């Protein structure tokens, strides 16, 4: 071996030794990006534990986006945007989680009975009817009338306490699945129909009927004559909380 070759070999040995010392612990494992923080990142938890009134977004993406429209006493810990529900069903208010969540499986229902609802109404009539924010056909309804305990327990499978002193009245928690939630218990002050109804945006709404009629309905308490009307026409000035009723037909009979 020539002196030049020996010198070159010696230099290479020193270079390799220096690289090994600079590396430190000698770990030469090549780590892929999938072995790092991305793999250890925990999956986001669903903003709800269970849901009866699930809604799927119209966005054509996969996994799809879901939102739970259940009204609850307290949102799940994973919910980021918990908003107050209008006209909540619980004492002290109700809340809805408005988060959208991307998942293949939105999770189980909270109320197993919703899978086999009875088509029979638990109530004969209802003034404070509420349509649930679900999208089946026919729709789902709940009656929030305050009843005497004996009335509620006789008609409903489940009752809850109404707001106010305890013990007091009860509210039926049963859900009815059908197209017709039934008649009102308290008659509308203007009768069964109205052409000129004015209602606020509450749920249920408070309404007035400005129809000019030959005579007010028997249930009207504040019946006033329209000025300068000949023959005389009348308007019921009462307010009513609930649906104002269908349009009167034919209009000429008013």
From Swiss-Prot:
Keywords: Disulfide bond, Protease inhibitor, Repeat, Serine protease inhibitor, Signal. Sequence repeats lie at residues 46-120, 121-187, 188-251. The keyword Oxidoreductase does not apply. Disulfide bonds join 51-248, 125-185, 126-143, 152-159, 156-172, 193-248, 194-209, 199-207, 216-223, 220-236. Pfam families: Bowman-Birk_leg. The gene is RBBI3.3. The lineage of its organism: Eukaryota, Viridiplantae, Streptophyta, Embryophyta, Tracheophyta. This is Bowman-Birk type bran trypsin inhibitor. Residues 23-118, 252-254 form a propeptide. It comes from Oryza sativa subsp. indica. The keyword Ion transport does not apply. One of its GO terms (cellular component) is extracellular region. The record marks 135-136, 201-202 as: Reactive bond for trypsin. Belongs to the Bowman-Birk serine protease inhibitor family. GO terms for molecular function: serine-type endopeptidase inhibitor activity. Induction: By wounding. PROSITE patterns: BOWMAN_BIRK. Transmembrane segments: none annotated. Expressed in roots, leaves and flowers. Residues 1-22 form the signal peptide.
């Amino acid at each position: 071996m020539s002196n030049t070759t020996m010198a070159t070999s010696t230099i290479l040995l020193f270079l390799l030794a220096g690289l090994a010392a600079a590396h430190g612990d000698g770990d030469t494992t090549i780590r892929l990006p999938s072995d790092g923080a991305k793999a250890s990142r925990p999956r986001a938890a669903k903003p709800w534990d269970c849901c009866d009134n699930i809604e799927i977004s119209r966005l054509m993406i996969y996994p799809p986006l879901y939102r739970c429209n259940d009204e609850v006493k307290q949102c799940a810990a994973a919910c980021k945007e918990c908003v107050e529900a209008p006209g909540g069903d619980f004492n002290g208010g109700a809340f809805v989680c408005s988060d959208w969540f991307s998942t293949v499986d939105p999770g189980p229902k909270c109320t197993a009975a919703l899978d086999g609802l009875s088509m029979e109404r638990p109530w004969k009539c209802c003034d404070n009817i509420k349509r649930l924010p679900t999208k089946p056909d026919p729709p789902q309804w709940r009656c929030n009338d305050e009843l005497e305990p004996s009335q509620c327990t006789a008609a409903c499978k489940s009752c809850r306490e109404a707001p106010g002193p305890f013990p007091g009245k009860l509210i039926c928690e049963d859900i009815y699945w059908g197209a017709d939630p039934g008649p009102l218990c308290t008659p509308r002050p203007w009768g069964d129909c109205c052409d000129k109804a004015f209602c606020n945006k509450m749920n249920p709404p408070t309404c007035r009927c400005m129809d000019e009629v030959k005579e007010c309905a028997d249930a009207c308490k504040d019946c006033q004559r329209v000025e300068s009307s000949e023959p005389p026409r009348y308007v019921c000035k009462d307010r009513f909380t609930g649906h104002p009723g269908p349009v009167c037909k034919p209009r000429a009979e008013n």
